Amino acid sequence: MLTAKGNKRQVVKHSYTDMAQKEEIGTTSTNKTPLTQREKAVLKMYNTHQIKGDGAPPFPLKLQILLKIVHNEGHDDIISWLPHGRAFGIHKPGLFEHEIMKRFFKQSQIASFQRQLNLYGFIRLSSGSDKGAYYHESFLRGRPLLSLGIIRIRIKGNKTRPAPSLPEEEPQFYKMPFLGPVDLSPGCDGENHDTMRPQQEVRMSAFS
């Protein structure tokens, strides 16, 4: 498939690995692997809602913290995790840009935020009840340590806009186990108990 200028257009690929099936350090009583200093730092930032100052978290972790804070403040109508906990949606772009972004990011325009999502490999869903939401297989509700595996992509050569993705290839999140918040106590040492709360499989659109 070519662009209007005759350049080859890259098609969005939706290969998805269920990272929730991978035991995350510090979330189960059966996993005795000690936390690294980096992992401890991530959990500290996540638990204390550290978003600014020295040692500010990278974009994926900051987004995890943002979603947690916004939920605690009762502003899920602006931005939130979707019911399955595997993607998030921006429901009110105007309010997100003017009331949320300035608190968490240096950028002031939603287009800049979307560019960051693209640079970190987030993919936009193009169909179904979650149309317009973003996901990354290592970006899951209550699993901040997985964000360590989200790497910023280096763009080389000609920049071409990806073609629309094929709906039939997009992950079927509502057919996967729903992910609830995980209690990650400050100072957990790898012997923390998994307190994930089961989620009701309510098939509802966060964009309705």
Regions found by a protein language model. Give the residues of each.
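Extended low-complexity, intrinsically disordered regulatory tracts
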Residues: 1-208
